[in-house]
Amino acid sequence: MNQSNTRLRQLCLCFCAVLTAVLLWRWQRIFYLMCADYIRSDMPAHVQLALSHNDYGLSSYLIRFLWGLRGEHFGQTALSLVLTANQLFGIFTLWLLLRHWLPELEGAFAWLAVLLAHLCGPWILPGQSEMYLGVYNGNVYHNMTVLFSRSFIPLDLLLFARLWESRRGKLPPKTWLGFALSLLVTTLFKPSFFVAFAPVALALLVWDFIKTRARGVVSELLLGLAFLPAAGALLWSYMALFAGEFAGTESHMILRRLTPAWLGWTLVMYLRGLLLPLYSFFTQGRRETRQRERLGIFAAVNAVAIAEAIFLTETGFRANDGNFDWGCLSLYTAVFSLAIGLLFRMGQQPAKGDARQRLRLAVGLALLLGHLVIGVYCLSRPGRAGYDWFYF
């Protein structure tokens, strides 16, 4: 049995190495086509804003630095390589987080789960044919700011979890500083995650304060202070994006006007995108009793992000940008990494002749296959004749 497991682990490592190389090659090609404006994306607009000194995030400074080195063509190539390296960094940080969530899942299979999560897309249903835009699909290659922030989000969640689990004693200074810096960088690239994460963290701190009758108030205050730099970055982003100077007009946040038809469409959209995560969470997630608090915090953050996407919107020149969607979209690969990791954990547990467990595993694998088919199709299309993201 041990020899069989060792061989399976070796095969998994070899497959992961090949798949990682293929993904990096494909991503670099996609990013270059976008940077050079061969296929439609948000990147040319980001470049134009950055070169015009309309700064609204770290990506603006990165663009100006790369374009200032050796001109436009070098900048386009360099940015595509930086984005590709960022994808690899995001895979690594998400692997660390998944190992924290599911420590009994072997490292090779955790890496495979993260890779497959980057290939998943929403299921296609009759009458609901969209695959990329207008759906819950987190592999949003057309927007660089969410790609950069998404790579740091696993560090935010991991370091916060370590601080939260240390709150009964002295908080580790290096972990506290690392969390504050990571959350600041995430927010400077894209503030959407902070808007979803901060309310959950505040609720946890208030709940703990009441539960312990203020016995851990010092640690709770210190943990709350770690959010202040990112809160300042959020305020700066708000002033840059919503002030009249940015586009000659104003934009505001309001509650969305909900209709039964729109709510029905939204429910179908999220179900299409979350079939496997919902299935894995309710079949296997409840069995991970030792990780219940960790998984529960992440589920709460994702639920708040989805609620913000449903109930909040913008007016003015940003009315149709869908910027409150980015919070839950930036968590997409983390959601699917956890879902696939739970599916692998289901396969790790001996069935002992239990036909129901084998059936549950087979259903999960079928759901995963459906997500993978769409994700691979979307990833394969850029560069083909007549291709445009918005044809989805």
Give short role names for the model-derived ranges:
Residues 81-105, 155:
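Transmembrane-helix motifs of polytopic, lipid-linked glycan transferases
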Residues 45-84:
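Short hydrophobic/aromatic helix or loop-helix immediately within or flanking a transmembrane segment
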Residues 159-184:
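Short hydrophobic alpha-helices at membrane interfaces in multi-pass membrane enzymes
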